[in-house]
Amino acid sequence: MLSVFVLPGGARAQTTTPQEWIEIGTRAHGGFGALIPIGIRIGLDALQRLKTSPRGVIVRYRSGETAPCPCVADGIMVATQASPGQGTLKVLDEKAGQGLLLDVEIEDRKTGATLRYRVASRWQPQVVTWNKTLDPLGRYQAVMAADAMIEPAGP
């Protein structure tokens, strides 16, 4: 089954509240587990650090050996508006390195500047706990407060 997700009129730019992210993430993914806000956080950070706008990036995503699914890619998609249909979001068959839950590269389409984000596998038990014990808003808040979770590298 293929789900199509469209943000009318560039809605992402105006979407700033946690509740709006939860609604969009749920619509795009079909649920709002803790992996979705991890992707949102990565996507927003990349747009800010690259000083680009939504649809201005190419995303290359790799899941780790123990990752349950590439759900984080859906969070990145809603934050950046990168899209498999546009060829700007690619979930690669190649796995992330040893000890990683995920490894993602986000490239500015105009400048070629690239950022890399990694989340260590040691975070997987915490993500599972958040999914079992917190509601969607609690998951969003927990991810946004977990400063050590996401390891960015690049410009």
Predicted regions and their residues:
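Non-transmembrane, aqueous-exposed alpha-helical and coiled segments at domain scale
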Residues: 14-32, 37-155
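Sec/Tat signal peptide C-region and signal peptidase I cleavage site
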Residues: 9-13
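Bacterial N-terminal signal peptides
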Residues: 1-6
